[in-house]
Amino acid sequence: MSEKGGKGLKSSLKSKDGGKDGSSTKLKKGRKIHFDQRTPPANYKILNVSSDQQPFQSSAAKCGKSDKPTKSSKNSLHSFELKDLPENAECMMDCEAFQILDGIKGQLVGLSEDPSIKIPVSYDRALAYVESCVHYTNPQSVRKVLEPLKTYGISDGEMCVIANASSESVDEVLAFIPSLKTKKEVINQPLQDALEELSKLKKSE
């Protein structure tokens, strides 16, 4: 449109600073902005959806099956059931377990020649575990120190925890065995004496 015929009509696009016609593709310093007018990637498409839906949807999301477990994954899950120990079961300290497993180690050659005896795969792992956390080399001495605690209501299982934890104070023992907190006034001194004796065993060994 010529200047004469278009005096009454002004461009609806004006810049804020000068009132002159502005362009959406220019900045104040004259730098041009290039708009990418290419179409979106093939695996995404723009949807006219409601506000509670996502504006973009990938081709992978259409199927809606990626978040569901497959049959193979279900089969790989194992269920474990806690069972009570047999009545004749006895708790064992780490040092006692190590003594037994280490004794078997010296007989492995002869045992492997007997077809009726099969050493479980877990043997090596069990031996390595108890060997790494054992604190005493003489289980009989440890039992002798802890046995008197039974008169104060401490069970075999709790005795094993005391030995395995190698605690240095009564408070540490109570942290490992909260059930003993109700007996603290009764067992405090006997337990402290036992811990001191266990400490001597560790130093002497």
Curated annotation (Swiss-Prot):
<comment type="similarity">
    <text>Belongs to the eukaryotic RPB4 RNA polymerase subunit family.</text>
</comment>
<dbReference type="InterPro" id="IPR045222">
    <property type="entry name" value="Rpb4-like"/>
</dbReference>
<dbReference type="GO" id="GO:0005634">
    <property type="term" value="C:nucleus"/>
</dbReference>
<dbReference type="GO" id="GO:0035194">
    <property type="term" value="P:regulatory ncRNA-mediated post-transcriptional gene silencing"/>
</dbReference>
<dbReference type="Pfam" id="PF03874">
    <property type="entry name" value="RNA_pol_Rpb4"/>
</dbReference>
<dbReference type="GO" id="GO:0000418">
    <property type="term" value="C:RNA polymerase IV complex"/>
</dbReference>
<feature type="region of interest" description="Disordered">
    <location>
        <begin position="1"/>
        <end position="79"/>
    </location>
</feature>
<keyword id="KW-0539">Nucleus</keyword>
<dbReference type="InterPro" id="IPR010997">
    <property type="entry name" value="HRDC-like_sf"/>
</dbReference>
<dbReference type="GO" id="GO:0006352">
    <property type="term" value="P:DNA-templated transcription initiation"/>
</dbReference>
<dbReference type="InterPro" id="IPR006590">
    <property type="entry name" value="RNA_pol_Rpb4/RPC9_core"/>
</dbReference>
<dbReference type="InterPro" id="IPR005574">
    <property type="entry name" value="Rpb4/RPC9"/>
</dbReference>
<protein>
    <recommendedName>
        <fullName>DNA-directed RNA polymerases IV and V subunit 4</fullName>
    </recommendedName>
</protein>
<dbReference type="InterPro" id="IPR038324">
    <property type="entry name" value="Rpb4/RPC9_sf"/>
</dbReference>
<feature type="compositionally biased region" description="Polar residues">
    <location>
        <begin position="48"/>
        <end position="60"/>
    </location>
</feature>
<dbReference type="GO" id="GO:0000419">
    <property type="term" value="C:RNA polymerase V complex"/>
</dbReference>
<comment type="function">
    <text>DNA-dependent RNA polymerase catalyzes the transcription of DNA into RNA using the four ribonucleoside triphosphates as substrates. Component of RNA polymerases IV and V which mediate short-interfering RNAs (siRNA) accumulation and subsequent RNA-directed DNA methylation-dependent (RdDM) transcriptional gene silencing (TGS) of endogenous repeated sequences, including transposable elements. Required for the de novo DNA methylation directed by the RdDM pathway.</text>
</comment>
<comment type="subunit">
    <text>Component of the RNA polymerase IV and V complexes. Interacts with NRPD1 and NRPE1.</text>
</comment>
<dbReference type="GO" id="GO:0000166">
    <property type="term" value="F:nucleotide binding"/>
</dbReference>
